[in-house]
Every structure is written in C-alpha cells, then in structure tokens.
C-alpha cells in the first residue's frame, strides 16, 4: 500500500515537465494523508507516525494558503478536484 506518485503527478501537472507546482505538491500530500488516515484506523497508538501526518497536513495547508494568495482560480479548481473543504 503506497501512493502511485507518477499517476498523481500526471493527473495534476500544469505542463509536460511539471513536478513541483503547488497543485502537484498538494495532490501528493493529500494522497499520502489519505493513506496514513487509513493506517490509523488499525494502529491507534502509532504516535510517531501521527506526528508525521500532522506535519504533512500543516505543509499542505501552507501550500494551499500560498496558492490561494497567488491565484484564487487555481486554488478553487484544485479544492474541487481533490474533494477538500466539504
């Protein structure tokens, strides 16, 4: 059980060579966060991994704030695409 990095990049890239845009970074973090969330359903006392999860959530929040400040339309489309902010 791991994140299919290439598929996530393909689905969210802005150009042919894009691997580091905020959209791609947020999508990769979201995929890893969802994977870890499932892990915690069975391993409730895994506090070391929970710390890593919180760091990923904070990093994603920072990237989303940056994207919202720079380009609101890209932010809105990414939120819809990933299903965040219900």
From Swiss-Prot:
Q: Which UniProt keywords apply?
A: Ribonucleoprotein, Ribosomal protein, RNA-binding, rRNA-binding
Query: What are its GO biological-process terms?
Result: translation
Disulfide bridge map: none
Q: Name one Pfam family in it.
A: Ribosomal_S15
Secretion signal, residue range per the UniProt entry: none
The UniProt regions of compositional bias labelled Basic and acidic residues, in chain numbering, are 7-16
The question of whether rRNA-binding is a record keyword is answered with yes
Per its UniProt entry, which superkingdom is the organism in?
A: Bacteria
Q: Which HAMAP family match?
A: Ribosomal_uS15_B
Q: What does this protein do?
A: One of the primary rRNA binding proteins, it binds directly to 16S rRNA where it helps nucleate assembly of the platform of the 30S subunit by binding and bridging several RNA helices of the 16S rRNA.
Tell me its family: Belongs to the universal ribosomal protein uS15 family.
State whether it acts alone or in a complex, and with which partners, per the record. Answer: Part of the 30S ribosomal subunit. Forms a bridge to the 50S subunit in the 70S ribosome, contacting the 23S rRNA.
Name of the protein this chain belongs to: Small ribosomal subunit protein uS15
């Amino acid at each position: 059980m791991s994140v299919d990095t290439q598929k996530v990049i393909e689905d969210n890239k802005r150009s042919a060579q894009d691997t580091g845009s905020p959209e791609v970074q947020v999508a990769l973090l979201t995929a890893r966060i969802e994977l870890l969330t499932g892990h915690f359903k069975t391993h409730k006392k895994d506090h070391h991994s929970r710390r890593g999860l919180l760091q990923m959530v904070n990093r994603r929040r920072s990237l989303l704030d940056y994207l919202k400040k720079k380009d609101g339309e890209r932010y809105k489309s990414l939120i819809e695409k990933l299903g965040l902010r219900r």
